[in-house]
Every structure is written in C-alpha cells, then in structure tokens.
C-alpha cells in the first residue's frame, strides 16, 4: 500500500503482563512484518506500573535487530528525563520517541500533578530529547507545548523540510520527517494541525482502528474529558476538521 501510516500498539494487549517472552516473540513478529512494508511500530505507554517493562521490551526488540521500533514517554513522570538518556545511550541515532503529557492519574510521589507543572515538564522533555539527538514525535494539543517546541526547534536550526543540523542527527526513516513531527488525536485541534502542515511541518494523526475502536475512543474521552468538545465538534461540524 502507498498509505503513509505507522502502527501504535499497547504491549499489554499482547501479553506483556502475563508472559513477557510471549509478548516479545509476538511483537518481534509484528515488527518484522511491518519492516517489510517500511512501517514503523510505536509502543504506546500505559500507566507507570508498565513503564519499566515497556522500555525493556522496546530495548530487547532493538537488540534483536528491529530498527523500526520506538516508544512513548509521558512528560508528567519524574523519571522521563532519565528514560530519555537511557534510550539515547541504547539506540543512538535510531532513538525515536513520542512525547506526550500522559493521561493517567499518577501519584504526586512519582509525577507532576498540576496542569502548569505537567505542561512545563512535557516541554522540557521535548527539549531534552532534541538535545540528545533523538527523532521526536511532539504529541500534544496544548498551545504552550506546541509553541515551546516550535521555539526549541527554531533555536536549534531544525526547520521544516530542511536537513537536521544536529550532530549526530537521527537517521532518516521512511515516512518520517527531518528529526521531528507533530502528532494529534483524530478530531482534535484540526485547525492547529492544518496550520502546522501549511508551514511545512510534518504532522501525523492518531487514528483508532479495529473492532473495539469505539470502546477505545470512549475510554480516551473518559480519561481526558478536556478533548471531548473537540471530538464532538468534529462530529457535529465535520467541515471544521477536514484535512
């Protein structure tokens, strides 16, 4: 297919919490098959109980030779900067992360809990990832995070449709941009996404797929009611979110 699309998977859906070796074998097979079609596989991050095991399985997949593997990190967790350094050390120019705020409610002992602190921490995580030479998927609908990322990119000379000037820079992969991209949930902030795209930035839309797409979407709305208006607006007035 000529469709420029990648895959995001939740490792727990493939047995991560039941049988690690089985999950590794299954995800390895998926990564191998995806590679045949130049498809990138992203391991979604769930709550903090699964952070370490998700990172480990990503590292094990990379050690097996899968270079089309990346992970998601949540800006709100205190450990995220150390995790970024860990990934950069392990994967070098193949390091590829999606950074989001995180939707899971976490203890104040391990995570920031106020909106302002979460936004600041997420912006700092993006900055750290850029400084570590990673490919960064900036996955936020929050204007402060997006605007902060744009300033950080500009200050480092990382510009739309231009070669990444970082040394070393992340390796360019099929379907990827030069060092970064912006990512949005389907139906959320379509106006912002279109503006970024018109300015030359690579943007990507997260699209739920499969038999349980509706259940998944409803769960996301319960976990993050702040996006409910954007989704409802795109349903009632679909012309506001057209590409």
Segments (PLM) and residue ranges:
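Positively charged, amphipathic and often flexible ligand-engagement surfaces
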Residues: 1-243
